[in-house]
Amino acid sequence: MIAFRTLDDAVDLADKRVLVRVDLNVPMESGRVTDATRLKAILPTIRDITGKGGKAVLLAHLGRPKGRDESQSLAPVAKALEGELGRKVAFASDCIGDEAKSAVSRLASGEVIVLENTRFHAGEEKNAPDFIEALASLGDIYVNDAFSTAHRAHASTEGLARKLPAYAGRSMESEIEALTKALEAPQRPVLAVVGGSKVSSKLELLGNLVKKVDILVIGGGMANTFLAALGKKVGKSLCEHDLANTARDILKKAEAAGCEIVLPVDAVVATEFKANAAHRVTSVDDVKDDEMMLDAGPETVGIVKQKLDGAKTVVWNGPFGAFEMTPFDAATVAVARYVGDLTHKGRLLSVAGGGDTVAALNHAGTAERFSYVSTAGGAFLEWLEGKALPGVEALRR
């Protein structure tokens, strides 16, 4: 387990200015927040700090602005947070300088303020010492509650943790604990589901997982690359033929590590890539030249369920097929619901993450039944790849 200080260790917060790095990078439409999931995730940390009499000074980014860009201001996000928190949230139109200092100095014990987008300043992504100093002058201690940005060594995610007494927030703490239970010290057997379209985007992930898990189920477009590498005809299916040798190398590594690989044995195929296209279920040995595999078939789903029955831990990243279109969502939905049911019965610890994965589990209506669903995206993937995350490393005792 990673040793780091949590808010349990931060006992004396009365009247302290607590700089909290949070994830406010939420989807927006016409100046309104359209999904408040990330806002809800930080409420326990804010309430913990304010409940102890601390002044919560929130730091965050929104989008990828190149300098100041009012369309990516955090002002409307602060307003939405106010609604979620059920109390007033102040806002400062800058995150450093006189405006920020003045706004923070006006805070009373137990109050909350959102400072403007840290990425309006180039020093944020450069982890620049002068920018770190300017931020640090606004706080007495630092809390990181944004695991989703922990793979970036930026001023507000890494630099500040080395400048001020640093603690993990509640969301950060639960994310690290869930991932550690799933991969670093898991109950075995561990089964990983890795799907999605391309092997090329998940090479390091696959290479790391074959050393850590007992069973690796490969789905989605990337399964086609493995099937083609094994000599199967994949027709017009999405497939990275140039990675055939790489796919075979991963299979060899898995064999050497004692990791069982599960690939589709049947598929739902169509000649057109569109919702409700005419389709059929066929063996992966019988895909015609004008057909594309768009989902795993029912026999494959049955095999995966059988493997899940014997597993104790599941790590999931990526869908089985083109889940955004019916009927090519069937395998993803069936397996996701099965994992959710086993988890609900206490037979499985299940951790899932990555943008498409979260969307797929929500589509299946089963995200709530998983042990832990990470919204972290890039940081979740890098953790699965076995990489050290700067934002987490900086919190180590």
Swiss-Prot record:
Keyword Ligase appears in the UniProt entry: no
CDD domains: Phosphoglycerate_kinase
PROSITE patterns the record matches: PGLYCERATE_KINASE (PS00111)
Subcellular location as annotated: Cytoplasm
GO terms under biological process: gluconeogenesis; glycolytic process
InterPro entries for this protein: Phosphoglycerate_kinase, Phosphoglycerate_kinase_CS, Phosphoglycerate_kinase_N, Phosphoglycerate_kinase_sf
Pathway per the UniProt entry: Carbohydrate degradation; glycolysis; pyruvate from D-glyceraldehyde 3-phosphate: step 2/5
Residue positions binding ATP: K202, E324, G354, G355, D356, T357
Molecular function GO labels: ADP binding; ATP binding; phosphoglycerate kinase activity
Family, per entry: Belongs to the phosphoglycerate kinase family.
Full protein name: Phosphoglycerate kinase
